[in-house]
Amino acid sequence: MTSHRFFTDDGFEFLAMIALGSAPYRLSEVGEVYATADRITDGDGESWFEEWMATAARVRRIAEDCESRGDVVSARDAFLRAANYAATAFFYVLATDDPSRSLHTWRSHRRDFDRAMKLWPTPVSHVEIPY
């Protein structure tokens, strides 16, 4: 059996495998992961960040389109994927040309996740834990 690697960079490879392994849980789609990985320059944190954020933005637009047409299930699943892709981008934001984007990236992830939860078939409660 032949093995396949997306990247020679072990950190990139590990996170790409996590993204790929999220597909059965509707947190990614195999084709989206492959297409994103194909655009990333191996070992370049800026490239990693930019490409995953671009995928998150594209999938978010899909979610919003589905939501506007009343396709709640597809919208929810797309918002979950967008949230996961922003979280995947977040891992390397500190290795980019502008690490100050970390807060915006986290908020993007959280916004998409919260939008998915609003479309969940059972009630979901937001809980704040003060610490």
What residue ranges belong to the model's regions?
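Residue signature of alpha-solenoid helical repeat architecture, marking inter-repeat boundaries
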Residues: 27-28, 46-54, 72-73, 77-80
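Short, charge-rich amphipathic alpha-helical segments embedded
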Residues: 72, 76-104
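A structural signal for well-ordered alpha-helices, especially hydrophobic packing surfaces
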Residues: 60-63, 86-93, 113, 117
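Flexible helix-coil transition and linker loops at the boundaries of alpha-helical arrays
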Residues: 68-72, 116-119
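Long, non-catalytic architectural segments outside compact domain cores
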Residues: 1-48
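N-terminal cap/lid segment of alpha/beta-hydrolase-fold proteins
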Residues: 52, 106-131
